[in-house]
C-alpha cells in the first residue's frame, strides 16, 4: 500500500470513528480530497485507492487535471471548485467542474448559470458563509443567506445543494463545535425550504471531529492525504 492509499485509509477510519461516536452513519459523510498543488500522479494514486471526489482551489490548475483524466478515459470522478472565484474565471468553472463551493454573491452565481453548458447537468453549488466574520475570507453573513439562497434557487443551470464554511482556527473542541453548530442550524433551516439542499461542507483535518458531531456531510482533507503542499509550483 502506497503512502496516499495508507493516508486515505487512515482518514476514512477517523471519519468513521467520529461519525460512530455521535451516533451517525459514516456513509452520511463524503470525503473530499483537496488536491490543490498536487500532481496528477498523486491524484491517480488516490483514485486507485478508491477516492472519487477531489477539491481544487485554483481554476486553471483544476481544469488541467480534469482534462488530463478525461483524456485518459477515467470516468466517475467528481471535481469540486473550493477556492475564491473571480468573475473572469467563472466560465472555466461552469464548463468543467461538477461543484462550486464558494458562491458568495448573486453576480457570480448568475455568471455560472449563464455559462453552464446546456449539455451538462446543472452545476451543484454551495453558498459560502463567513462564519467567523474574518475580513481575509470570502463568504456572506448568515443574516444574508435567505436572500441569496432564494435568488440562487431560481437559476435553472445551478442546483443549490447547501452551505460551506472555513471557520477560523480553534484549538479547543468545544469552540470548534459551537461554530460548527451555528452552520448546522442554518443548514437545517435551508433544507426545510429547498428540496435540493443536502450538503454541509464543513471540517478539515484539525476540526473534522467537531464538524461531524455538529452535522457536517462533507469534510475537506488535503495534507493528511497527500502530504505537505508545495506552493513553489503554483
Cite the ranges covered by each PLM segment.
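Short, Lys/Arg-enriched, disordered terminal segments
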Residues: 1-2, 232-234
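Conserved alpha/beta-domain cores
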Residues: 1-206, 214, 226
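Expand to "…catalyze enediolate/carbanion chemistry for C-C bond making/breaking, isomerization
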Residues: 210-213, 221, 225-232
Amino acid at each position: 500500500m502506497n503512502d496516499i492509499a495508507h493516508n486515505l485509509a487512515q482518514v476514512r477510519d477517523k471519519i468513521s470513528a467520529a461519525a460512530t461516536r455521535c451516533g451517525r452513519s459514516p456513509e452520511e459523510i463524503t470525503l473530499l480530497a483537496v488536491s490543490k498543488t498536487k500532481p496528477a500522479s498523486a491524484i491517480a494514486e488516490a483514485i486507485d485507492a478508491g477516492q472519487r471526489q477531489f477539491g481544487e482551489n485554483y481554476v486553471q490548475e483544476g481544469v488541467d487535471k480534469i482534462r488530463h483524466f478525461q483524456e485518459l478515459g477515467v470516468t466517475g470522478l467528481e471535481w469540486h471548485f473550493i477556492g475564491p472565484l473571480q468573475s473572469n474565471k467563472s466560465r472555466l468553472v461552469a464548463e468543467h467542474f461538477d461543484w462550486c463551493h464558494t458562491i458568495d454573491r448573486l453576480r457570480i452565481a448568475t455568471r455560472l448559470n449563464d455559462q453552464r453548458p446546456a449539455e451538462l447537468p446543472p452545476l451543484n453549488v454551495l453558498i459560502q458563509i463567513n462564519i467567523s466574520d474574518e475580513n481575509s475570507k470570502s463568504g456572506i453573513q448568515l443574516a444574508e443567506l435567505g436572500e441569496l439562497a432564494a435568488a440562487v434557487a431560481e437559476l435553472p443551470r445551478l442546483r443549490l445543494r447547501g452551505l460551506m464554511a472555513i471557520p477560523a482556527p480553534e484549538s479547543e473542541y468545544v469552540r470548534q463545535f459551537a461554530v460548527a453548530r451555528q452552520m448546522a442550524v442554518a443548514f437545517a433551516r435551508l433544507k426545510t425550504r429547498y428540496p435540493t439542499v443536502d450538503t454541509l461542507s464543513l471540517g478539515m483535518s484539525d476540526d473534522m471531529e467537531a464538524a461531524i458531531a455538529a452535522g457536517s456531510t462533507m469534510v475537506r482533507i488535503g495534507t493528511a492525504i497527500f502530504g505537505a503542499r508545495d506552493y513553489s509550483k503554483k
